[in-house]
């Protein structure tokens, strides 16, 4: 049986009501199934010419875009939320990204530490490096690096003034003098050329549109070695 079409304004209203907790569970599940079905249909139309055309249009759209969009909205939704909320819901490191659980007995605090150590291993971090972290969140990796590589200099970039304040406070408390936190929109971030040995960005790329432009800037910021 063909299901009746739901107009975009009406669908938007239903989503708003569901986010407010004003719809029963069965309606929320039904709506999710409909949206997923429609998305799958749109994404997997089998005609190769259609797929290629759609892919090329997406590439061109990304190339014409700024590095990131809706940065103010992201701040409002996530990054300028009171830090006390995240202190109550995240682990000890306040890691606002994935953790690594090597086994089922691993706690959240341990999983945060495991993930931070894994970043270090994969990025080949060490002392005496200049390290840039783009999208540092509440400083889980920045503070971990400052603690484990005291002879390295770390520059952390966040678009959130409350995140900067929180990291600066913890640096003062821990006596870290090797951390600089910059509040900046990545679209307008200006840094010296050939300054950094490592550039790290953890789960920030969901906000990025123009990957090419960002990678060009990162290439300029990295040292030649």
Give the ranges of each region predicted by the language model.
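A short glycine-rich, Lys/Arg-flanked "PGG" loop and its adjoining helix->strand segment in the class I
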Residues: 212-225
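Conserved class I S-adenosyl-L-methionine
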Residues: 128-137
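Conserved SAM-binding loop of SAM-dependent methyltransferases across substrates and taxa
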Residues: 138-150
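Conserved Class I S-adenosyl-L-methionine-dependent methyltransferase catalytic core
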Residues: 38-122, 126
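Conserved SAM-binding motif I beta-strand of class I
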Residues: 153-158
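Conserved SAM-binding loop
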Residues: 167-168
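Conserved SAM-binding strand-loop segment of SAM-dependent methyltransferases
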Residues: 173-188
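A short acidic, Gly/Pro-enriched loop at the edge of an enzyme's catalytic core
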Residues: 188-199
